[in-house]
């Protein structure tokens, strides 16, 4: 009896093993027909509007790619995760995507802090990475597998300072969030260039936890600067603008691309402010209007710059991957991305410099009657 039971167990285990091998083979076969792209962004938390918009823009482009037959016969499969805007959450999600989901390419993160943390991990794993919207310069520095779609903090900081000079401004106060890589990077580049332009620059700082800016703004009001430059994200900027209005501050407010989204809840207090961007909803460019129509049809809301950059990231990957004969080669993929040089993007013509950062024109936006309006391209 013991012999029969043992034999039955053996036969049962052999059957299980056979099923396991077959299922693994089926999975491997299935995986060969897809390109797995990991996507991480804040879908909840303080910068959820950024994460949701970026990922939605990217998913819209992927939907279009798959509907048109995919990439060389392969469909794109998205593996998605919510970082909640937290660096450690983003790191954990990325590690899981590499070790368990076996992604081929990574798109993310959305903001600079998590992107800076993930970039060296992507480089080490040799996973081609594109951050659609992470602007900190060091994200790509020295990492040949890491690219971006947006311009960098130094790039836009320099251009905004030159733009301010072109408008004849002679005195500017900079408000810097010391707890934000984005704010510090943009602030430093702006201050350096503004001083080169002969502009008188003062600076005041606050922390990421601050909510009451009245004491700081009262001090700033005493400077009587023509411009107050605030390089930060829309939620914090909204509080600053609201309190500045209460204090009767009439300086011209300016900012970087983190302002996009200000129109949702703070359009009234932001009226007249000007900020750097790469996308204007009223831009008559055919690519812009076609994208806006498709996005509104898909999500029933107007897109912001983050959605446009997410969509453009999909276009960059589509173009690059179609030029790769062996899609299993990560080296071939990252080289194809490097060689991208396209004019058919929503955010304008783009080519990569030596550090895999895009060179493109800066679009200046003015908040008018609670909406974003194209001011000029500079």
Predicted regions and their residues:
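Extracellular/periplasmic bilobed ligand-binding domains
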Residues: 186-276
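Beta-alpha junction/loop-to-helix N-cap segments that form part of ligand/metal-binding clefts
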Residues: 27-34, 49-56, 68-140, 149, ...
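Extracellular/periplasmic periplasmic-binding protein-like sensory domains
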Residues: 241-311, 366, 371-377
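Periplasmic-binding protein-like
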Residues: 97-110, 130-132, 173-176, 224-234, ...
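Segments of small-molecule ligand-sensing domains
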Residues: 297-307, 318-372
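An alpha-beta-alpha
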Residues: 146-208, 227, 317
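Short, low-complexity disordered leader/linker segments with a strong preference
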Residues: 1-36, 378
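Extracytoplasmic "Venus flytrap"
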Residues: 38-59, 81-88, 110-111, 175-184, ...
């Amino acid at each position: 009896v013991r012999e029969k039971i043992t034999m039955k167990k053996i036969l049962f285990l052999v059957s299980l093993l056979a099923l396991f091998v077959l299922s693994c083979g089926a999975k491997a076969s299935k995986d060969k027909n897809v390109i797995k792209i990991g996507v991480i962004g804040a879908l909840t938390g303080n910068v959820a509007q950024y994460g949701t918009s970026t990922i939605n823009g990217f998913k819209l482009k992927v939907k279009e790619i798959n509907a048109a037959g995919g990439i060389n016969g392969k469909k794109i499969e998205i593996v998605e995760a919510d970082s909640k805007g937290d660096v450690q959450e983003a790191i954990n999600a990325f590690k899981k995507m590499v070790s368990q989901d076996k992604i081929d390419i990574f798109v993310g993160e959305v903001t600079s802090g998590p992107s800076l943390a993930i970039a060296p991990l992507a480089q080490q794993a040799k996973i081609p990475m594109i951050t659609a919207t992470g602007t900190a310069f060091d994200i790509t520095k020295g990492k040949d597998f890491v690219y971006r779609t947006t311009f960098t903090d130094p790039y836009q900081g320099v251009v905004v300072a030159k733009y301010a000079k072109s408008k004849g401004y002679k005195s500017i106060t900079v408000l810097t969030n010391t707890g934000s890589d984005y704010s510090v990077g943009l602030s430093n580049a702006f201050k350096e260039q503004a001083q080169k332009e002969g502009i008188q620059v003062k600076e005041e700082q606050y922390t990421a936890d601050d909510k009451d800016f009245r004491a700081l703004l009262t001090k700033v009001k005493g400077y009587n600067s023509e411009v107050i430059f605030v390089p930060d994200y829309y939620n914090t900027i909204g509080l600053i603008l609201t309190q500045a209005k209460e204090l009767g501050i009439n300086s011209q407010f300016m900012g970087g691309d983190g302002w996009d989204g200000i129109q949702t809840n703070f359009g009234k207090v932001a009226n007249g402010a000007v900020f750097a961007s790469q996308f204007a909803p009223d831009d008559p460019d055919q690519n812009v209007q076609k994208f806006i129509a498709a996005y509104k049809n898909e999500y029933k809301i107007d897109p912001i710059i983050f959605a446009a950059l997410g969509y453009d990231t999909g276009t960059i990957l589509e173009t690059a991957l179609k030029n790769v004969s062996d899609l299993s080669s990560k080296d071939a993929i990252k080289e194809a991305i490097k060689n991208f040089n396209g004019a058919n993007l929503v955010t304008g013509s783009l080519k990569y410099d030596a550090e895999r950062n895009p060179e493109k024109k800066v679009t200046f936006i003015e908040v008018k009657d609670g909406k974003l309006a194209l001011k000029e391209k500079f």
